[in-house]
């Protein structure tokens, strides 16, 4: 009989301790919510910007149009022996193959 009472008391004390830590955990989650939501919103914003840039590049590829760039702006990319055109230089300027800029 005493063993049952001791066992019940031990079980109740363990359950009370577990309930307290869960409540504290919930309180910490509520306090950390603004920080976590701001971080998630920042990551989502970066993803949306990246998707918009990719969509713009897809439109340029589809219609075969290359955007125009200003003088002094990089106009080409070199990867090994190959060169790729990033943008079209304005009239009167040309893309320098050494500097990869509109001059």
UniProtKB/Swiss-Prot annotation:
A GO term for molecular function: toxin activity
Top-level taxon of origin: Eukaryota
Tissues where the protein occurs: Expressed by the venom gland.
Disulfide-bonded cysteines: 69-87, 75-95, 89-102
Pro-peptide region(s): 24-52
Location in or out of the cell: Secreted
One GO CC annotation: extracellular space
Signal peptide: 1-23
GO terms for biological process, alphabetical: adult feeding behavior; cellular response to starvation; defense response to bacterium; defense response to fungus; G protein-coupled receptor signaling pathway; killing of cells of another organism; negative regulation of appetite; positive regulation of MAPK cascade
Role played: These peptides may have low toxicity to eukaryotic cells and low antimicrobial activities against bacterial and fungi. It is unknown whether these CART-related peptides affect feeding, as mammalian CART peptides do.
UniProt name for this protein: Niq CART3
Protein species of origin: Thalassophryne nattereri
